[in-house]
């Protein structure tokens, strides 16, 4: 789809495969949340979902916000693939993608960020953070950055880890059960993306309660 000058596209995709291609003209704004949440009542789920979002900024002064979250259990597999191409200058983009993986779940993030030679004065950020709740869960992260302009602000980062045992211990010392402490830490990890999705689509008011039922 083509987003014409100064138009806005905001959308939350919840538990559905996504294949989205947007060309942004001058001054347009894109804000997309891709969220895949496991069914807490079905630990045998073996679904395999692929999400691909491609954004091309072809006009000056565009803004792009891409957020992704996957909370997976059982044998579930989810891929979130983003392509953000800055072809002209003066644009901004921010990508934040998080995975929470339990049981034998598999996550895969591919983040493609390109800044063309003519895209001076671009600001672009890409962040991928992942939380493993099981020794059998696996995460693959593939950041791909191609920056051909020199007058830009561009950052990227990726991290994969487990719950902080020190934080869990401290919370248990304060009378919080280990299971509840685990839930609270997972909630805090997911909340940034879930809250943003809720602000975009008010019908998703229950999303911020999701982590508390994933026990």
Predicted regions mapped to residue ranges:
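Conserved beta-strand/loop scaffold segments within soluble protein domains that form the structured core
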Residues: 1-169, 173-176, 192, 205-215
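Active-site-proximal cofactor/substrate-binding loop regions of enzyme domains
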Residues: 172, 178-180, 185-197
